Each structure stands twice: as structure tokens, then as C-alpha cells.
Amino acid sequence: MTLAKIELLKQLLRDNEAKTVLRQTTVDQYNIIRKFNTSRIEKNPSLRMKWAMCSNFPLALTKGDMANRIPLEYKGIQLKTNAEDIGTKGQMCSIAAVTWWNTYGPIGDTEGFEKVYESFFLRKMRLDNATWGRITFGPVERVRKRVLLNPLTKEMPPDEASNVIMEILFPKEAGIPRESTWIHRELIKEKREKLKGTMITPIVLAYMLERELVARRRFLPVAGATSAEFIEMLHCLQGENWRQIYHPGGNKLTESRSQSMIVACRKIIRRSIVASNPLELAVEIANKTVIDTEPLKSCLAALDGGDVACDIIRAALGLKIRQRQRFGRLELKRISGRGFKNDEEILIGNGTIQKIGIWDGEEEFHVRCGECRGILKKSQMRMEKLLINSAKKEDMKDLIILCMVFSQDTRMFQGVRGEINFLNRAGQLLSPMYQLQRYFLNRSNDLFDQWGYEESPKASELHGINELMNASDYTLKGVVVTKNVIDDFSSTETEKVSITKNLSLIKRTGEVIMGANDVSELESQAQLMITYDTPKMWEMGTTKELVQNTYQWVLKNLVTLKAQFLLGKEDMFQWDAFEAFESIIPQKMAGQYSGFARAVLKQMRDQEVMKTDQFIKLLPFCFSPPKLRSNGEPYQFLRLMLKGGGENFIEVRKGSPLFSYNPQTEILTICGRMMSLKGKIEDEERNRSMGNAVLAGFLVSGKYDPDLGDFKTIEELERLKPGEKANILLYQGKPVKVVKRKRYSALSNDISQGIKRQRMTVESMGWALS
């Protein structure tokens, strides 16, 4: 011991407390070391913790009534001592005390806990109702993938989520909500209701809300299902050499927004590519598309991933996309190298010459097709090497074919035997590279026969693959299968790309990374309701979707449509919305249905009896030129059939699955979705003179004024400026003076509320008009 340390010890011994500690306490006690350790930074935290937890009483209790509830011992196990902890002045206790407290300790007020910790209770519910299968032992091929750690109530970007949380917890301090926040008003309202009156600190509420709204994703080794309901139990489901079969219970919370978003984007692109300016139309439709109650743009910004279609629409709307390249089903991420494109005329195997952009330069890519992953090395018109992992035969085959085509290998061009004239769903001829892709996916033997074979590698972890996708002593030239795992490539970085008029995405380097031809041709049913608020899109949907969109549009524009009808404007039937609806009416019946519907509506107008629900129901059928019987009478129908059969029909005199109306509640049900007509049906609807409808936007201001000249027609009335007066014939030819209103008021207000006043005005003038 050095002299300096002896001097230091003498100083310490002058302090009575330190003197007692140094003489009576063993030096291996963790708490003493902690108390007198001069260094603030722990050199080995893990070892320190293990050391502490090995001692009998590593924990300290705070003083107070709660601490006194823990007994000194329970069933022979010592829980705490009367010894005082030097650091906290509390009692020393064992780790068994924690178990005792959790099991036998007092239970406080838990009201509201289920609402606040909803995500944890839902997790417990899924676990309680789960089905567990057998455990299998053996090698488990786990691949690192970017996965969502827990199911979400509704995924949104972190900054958007923080605004929503502020709006839920601190509405007064949050200020005026942004549009991106107000999109989630239903969620905000629901959460405010749920959390009202809970005595839990706001910071805890904010943390739990963040857990429900903000995605936490990690790259984890996974075998099998990757949805969040499985990932939250991943530690129980698989290891290096075992797997446990598991099916979560309850309702799956996995986002159906993502699936619906993909369906919507694919349909928008399919519709846009036939337009003269695909980009312009895609942007127009995307901005008018709503999934459930949320705009598509908001979904695309909030949700991670999707497919090619989603990235194209993201780019069209000015959002960033993940760094990746697509060639049909093939997904690529550049590892090294750079290519330069030159247009060349290539003689292909069927004897035709195709003008194709050929890429020059050595390049290496990480590639993926379905569950099959690999590394591709290519040079000009040559596939040098393709290393892939074992997967489903279909995915392996598609990956090999797509890499051969993408590499633009001369053997691939020579393998074409038949015609290449494939069309996309819009009936357009595909470009040469996509023609070749489609051709060889359908006729793989032509490619493999031309490609050639070589001896399989001798390395133990590699094997060859033949044309049947089986392991073999000989292999397709340059193609090798590895027994090792090739991890899924990460694409967390985002980048801003430019988009061409024809929906091709281009990087700053000029490289085309994907386009409309890469969008899947698959069609599926959206799990959530998609509303395209533009008739240009409706014909792409199912019969039910088109019916729903058309009637929603009619309801939205009901006041204008009703006024135009009552004014006798026959061209009102020629709306774009009804043109789309015509596509689901059987072609032979369209003219007959139109003649019938127009006749019924005209009869309502002539007899001065308006039924709003009947008006809404029949209006879309009036688009086609009317077809009448030889005697000039319209055909008669009780049921109007639509394409698709089954429940796709509308009953004229009663309700049907597509369209029904309850006059008591004034609720219209279209394809199962309820819409209110309250405020849109006037009290006098069954007994109204049509003459009043002419006065929509006008006030009766007195008796006929000779100075104003002759009686005006409807067309002349419409041309009047606000404040101008004119004479008209009201009711059954009664002459009155009207003035055009200076302010634009709702037509429905004039049509309904003004009727009684106008009628009384005219009747009070009866002596002057007789």
C-alpha cells in the first residue's frame, strides 16, 4: 500500500460512518462498491448486474407504507432484511420480493387500464385464443426480413402520429389541426371517448397511443409467416433447430389498408395507361380516391411498401419511394457496377429484327422473385453468374428465366421460336423486353434448350439445377444453387425519382427503375371500401362498386340534378357519371330501360308528384338514347337487371340488395351502405306544384308588371343577372313578377322552404290576378 493511500485511509477513518463501513462490511458487497466507486461510467454493466443479482439482497425498497406491506419472509423464503441500504436509506430486499408483490401485493384502481393498454390486452386475447400445434426439430432456414414487430390500430408516419396524439390528449394546446391530422378524425373522436376520465398520466397515454399508431420494424431472422401477429410471438415459434406451429386467435389486426391500397393503385394505372396523358390522369384519379375514409395519398405516405403500382403512384404524387428496380416479378437492388444503354437492332430466333436498348457494362445485383433470392452478375449481352437459394420450384424457375432475360444474353434472343405479340390488359402492345419476358415465362423450354448445360460445382454447399428445377450433377450454364441462406435485401433508404408522362420512374442517373409494364396483371377484391370520386375510374370496378359510386355521386349532386330535372333540361341525362353506369347495363336492354326510366320521371313531373328516392333510383338508367315500342309507348319493367347476375338488379317498386329506401327513417341503403336523405326531401314532396320549382333562385315580388315586358321563358330567366326582375306565368298560368336573388342560396332551400311563402304570396294576390 502506497503512502498516498495510507494518508487517504487515515482521512476516511476520521469520518465515523466511513469508519464503520470500512471495519464491518465485506468488500464484495455490490452496494458498497456502488456507493464508493468514483467512476460514473460502468466498465462492464452486464457483469455488474449479474454480480448484483447473485447476492441475497440486491434490491432496495423506498421508505413508506407500500414497502412495509412486504413481509420479512414468506413460506421460509426471506424477502427482505431490516438492514438499511446505504445509498437509498431503504430496506434491502431479495428478488423473491418482486415475485411476492406481483402475486400477493395489493391491487390498485385498474379502471381504464384495458382502454389505455389496449394493444397489450389484444395481444393477450390473441394468445389466449391461439391454437398451438406440434414442435418439429431439425434445421430451420431463417431469412432476415424487415418485419413489423406488433399489429397496429392504424399505421401513420411518426410526425403525423404525434399530431394525432396531441389532438387526442391535448385538444386545446394542439391548435388548429392540419389536414393530415383531420383525416383521422374518427379515430381521434373514438380515442377521446375511450380515454375520457382515466387517471393515468398523459405521458403513459402518449406512449401507448404511439405503440398503436407508429410502426416499429426490424430486420429479423424469420422462417414462415411474417405478419405482425406472428412476429410478436417469434421468440416462442422458432429457433436454430426447432419450429412451433402456431395460429393467433381473435380477429387478425393485420392492415387491410395495405391490401386495398395495392388494389386501388393497380386499377388506377390500368385505367391511366389508355389515356392520352397517363400521368395527368393517374394524378387526377389518385387525388380523388379514398380508402375507407382516408385519402389514398395519406395511405401511401403512411404505409410502408406495397408493390410496383404503389411506388408509381407515390412518385406521381411527389412522394419518395424505396430504392429498388423492377422487371416484372423480378425485384433488383444494385450491388456494384454501372450500365450504359445503347439502342441496337437485334436479330432474334424467329427471324425478326427488334430495336432494343442494350445495356453495356459489368453489373452485380441482389435479386428476388417471390421467396427465391439470389445474386446476379452480368456484362454486355451475357449472364456471367447467378447464385440462388433453394425455394418453391415456381419461384426458382421464374427467377432464373427473368434473370436470363434481364441480362439480355445472346442465347436468350436466339431462343425465341414463335411470335411475340403480347398485349397488356389495356390492349396495348408490350415493348420488346417485356414481350420476351412474357414469351419465356410461357415457353421456358425454348430458353433452357438454347441456354446449354455445364458440370455442377464440386463444393459441398453448392449444387446444380436442371430444367425441372431439381438438384442435378449438371446445371444450367452459370446458374448455381447454394445451401446457405441468402438474406432478404434491405431497402430502407428512400429516394426522390422523376416520372415520365407514360408512368416510367427514372433515377437521377437516367436509369429507368420501373414502369407501368411491371405492374402485376392480377386482380383481387379490396378488403376495405375504395371510393373513386371520378367517373373516369368507375367502369374499372365491379358492378356493385359502380352502382355505389354512381348513386353516391347522385346524392352529392342531388339538389342540382333535381332542379335541372324540374326545369325540363333533357340534356341533364348526359353526365359522365351515367356513361360509366351504362357499362353495367346489358347492351340490349339499355335503350328500353332508358325509355322506361325517362317516362316514369316525366310522369312524376307532369303529375306534380316528386318521389326523391325514385328519382335517384331511375336517373342513372336515363343515359342511353330511349328505345320505345312501335306504338311510341315505353317498355314496362318491375325489375332492372345489371351485368353479373345474382343480386345485381334493382327493383322498380320495392327495395333490393343494391338499392333500398326506408321512408320512416329517410335512410337509403346502397350495396349495404347506409346514406341519409334527411334534409333532402321536402315536406310538400307528394303535393307540390312544379311551377314553384321554376322559381329556384328567385323570389315572387308582386303582381304582373307591364313595364317589364312579356313573360320570360325558363331559358331567359336563367340569363337574368342577380337583382333583375321579370314577369313569368306561375302555376296554371298565373302572371307574377319575380326577382333573381342577389346571393346564391341552396337550390333545395328555394325549392322546398320557399314554396309555402310563394304560394301564400300568390294566393294573397288572388284578387289582383283574377
Swiss-Prot record:
Its main location: virion. GO terms for cellular component: host cell nucleus; virion component. One of its GO terms (molecular function) is RNA-directed RNA polymerase activity. Disulfide bonds: none annotated. Signal peptide: none annotated. It is found in: Virion; Host nucleus. A motif (Nuclear localization signal) lies at residues 740-743. Keywords: Cap snatching, Eukaryotic host gene expression shutoff by virus, Eukaryotic host transcription shutoff by virus, Host gene expression shutoff by virus, Host nucleus, Host-virus interaction, Inhibition of host RNA polymerase II by virus, mRNA capping, mRNA processing, Viral transcription, Virion. It comes from the Viruses. GO terms for biological process: 7-methylguanosine mRNA capping; cap snatching; DNA-templated transcription; symbiont-mediated suppression of host gene expression; symbiont-mediated suppression of host mRNA transcription via inhibition of RNA polymerase II activity; viral RNA genome replication. Plays an essential role in transcription initiation and cap-stealing mechanism, in which cellular capped pre-mRNAs are used to generate primers for viral transcription. Recognizes and binds a wide range of cap structures of target pre-RNAs which are subsequently cleaved after 10-13 nucleotides by the viral protein PA. Plays a role in the initiation of the viral genome replication and modulates the activity of the ribonucleoprotein (RNP) complex. Belongs to the influenza viruses PB2 family. Influenza RNA polymerase is composed of three subunits: PB1, PB2 and PA. Interacts (via N-terminus) with PB1 (via C-terminus). Interacts with nucleoprotein NP (via N-terminus). Interacts with host ANP32A (via C-terminus) and ANP32B; these interactions promote viral RNA synthesis. This is Polymerase basic protein 2. The gene is PB2.
